[in-house]
Regions:
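Hydrophobic ligand-binding cavity/cleft-lining segments
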Residues: 1-44
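Short, ordered beta-strand-loop transition motifs
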Residues: 5-11, 49-51, 71-73, 92-96
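Intrinsic-disorder/low-complexity, polar/charged segments enriched in Ser/Thr/Lys/Arg/Asp/Glu/Gln
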Residues: 13-15, 54, 64, 99-101
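Hydrophobic/aromatic beta-strand elements that line small-molecule binding cavities or substrate pockets
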Residues: 17-18, 67-71, 86-93
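Hydrophobic pocket/interface hotspot
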Residues: 27, 37, 55, 69, ...
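Glycine-rich portal/gate segments that line the openings of hydrophobic small-molecule binding cavities
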Residues: 38-84
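Beta-strand/loop substructures that line and gate deep hydrophobic ligand-binding cavities in soluble
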Residues: 79-131
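Short, highly charged C-terminal tails/helix-capping segments
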Residues: 131-156
Length: 156
């Protein structure tokens, strides 16, 4: 499902939703445990899982960016700084698993925004596939499809 993108005050809110047939604690582990995190976003690792702690982003050029965790409610909310923006994962229990909501608060829409949103879109799909025991193939091909859709939505 494509993200819902709206302007709210002085920011843009990109909201992704996934209904997962897995318990919250399992989904939470995919967001916060480095061995699982590496399977869907290998450039990220949790350095210190607490409010004020950090997520480390490997820029793939020998440099690293420290992303400060601004809200942590174990098992339900993880929010951290993403450059000038914010990313937030929320988990809600459902009878057959959980509802994952991912929100990116964007201060502006740039030429890079569709790349970012396509990346998050694919990452969320990959989490779901991995939890369901599916093989992840052609990840970059999927990204290209979503990149085109987000480009059309935001920049045309």
């Amino acid at each position: 499902m494509i993200a819902d993108i709206r302007q709210a005050d002085e920011v843009y809110i990109a909201r992704f939703e996934r209904r997962l047939k897995h318990p919250i604690q399992e989904v939470w582990s995919w967001l916060t445990e480095n061995d699982k995190l590496a399977e869907w976003f290998p450039e990220l690792r949790i350095d210190d899982l607490r409010e004020g702690g950090a997520v480390i982003f490997d820029m793939q050029d020998g440099t690293f960016e420290e992303l400060r965790i601004i809200e942590l409610q174990p098992g339900s909310v993880l929010e951290y700084v993403w450059g000038e923006d914010l990313v937030r994962f929320e988990l809600y229990p459902e009878s057959e698993g959980c509802h994952l909501v991912f929100i990116e608060k964007l201060h502006q829409i740039t030429d890079h925004t569709p790349k970012d949103l396509a990346g998050w879109h694919v990452c969320l799909d990959v989490i779901q596939k991995l939890m369901d025991g599916q093989t992840v193939e052609a990840r970059h091909e999927e990204w290209k499809i979503w990149y085109e859709k987000y480009t059309q939505m935001l920049l045309k």
